[in-house]
């Protein structure tokens, strides 16, 4: 995780399901319950695995979310990039990257997340607030905010929880949920095979 990095993953699932998802991963996290979402917040800057798989935010941003936990929305500030990910049902995760110049750009080999995609993802959670599409589109044009301010604005406009966890003002994040050792061993076995 970077010096200024922050991130949250919102899952349309119970907190028990979110805790299980964290335990099957490699990043220690806090899990906060909300009426419509479970909020997953990395508890550390690093995962429990060795480099190059040690950046908690990168791993959370790219982590697969199964259809039982979707829709899922991830919001991350990493170095000079803001990242929004969204996944609904069995569709692939889609990505919006906000570059250093504060413009939304396509990621190489990443399915692009459009305002319409994000709007559909949000609508997939019956507990989510209905947001006019024009408000979602307007977010893509906001270049007056820093990356973290922009991500908090996305959360605010979409009526999502987690803004205080994202900006660092919520200090009561609850216990740290640690990954299961078997999940860590399985991950390390897979990446070991990739690098041999």
Where are these regions (language model features)?
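Long, compositionally biased intrinsically disordered terminal regions
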Residues: 100-196
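Hydrophobic alpha-helical segments that drive targeting, anchoring, or assembly
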Residues: 2-140
């Amino acid at each position: 995780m970077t010096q200024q990095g922050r991130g949250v993953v919102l899952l349309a699932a119970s907190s028990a399901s979110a805790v299980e998802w964290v335990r099957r991963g490699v990043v220690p996290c806090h899990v906060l319950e909300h009426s419509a979402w479970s909020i997953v917040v990395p508890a550390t800057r690093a995962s429990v695995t060795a480099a190059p798989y040690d950046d908690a935010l990168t791993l959370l941003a790219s982590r697969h979310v199964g259809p039982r936990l979707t829709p899922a929305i991830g919001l991350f500030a990493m170095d000079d990039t803001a990242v929004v990910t969204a996944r609904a049902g069995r569709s692939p995760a889609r990505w919006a990257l906000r570059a250093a110049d504060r413009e939304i750009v396509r990621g190489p080999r990443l399915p692009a997340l459009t305002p319409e995609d994000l709007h559909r993802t949000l609508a997939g959670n019956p507990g989510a607030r209905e947001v006019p599409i024009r408000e979602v589109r307007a977010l893509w044009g906001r270049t007056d905010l820093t990356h973290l301010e922009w991500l908090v604005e996305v959360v605010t406009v979409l009526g999502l929880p987690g803004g205080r966890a994202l900006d660092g003002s919520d200090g009561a994040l609850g216990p740290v949920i640690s990954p299961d050792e078997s999940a860590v061993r399985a991950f390390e076995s897979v990446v070991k095979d990739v690098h041999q």
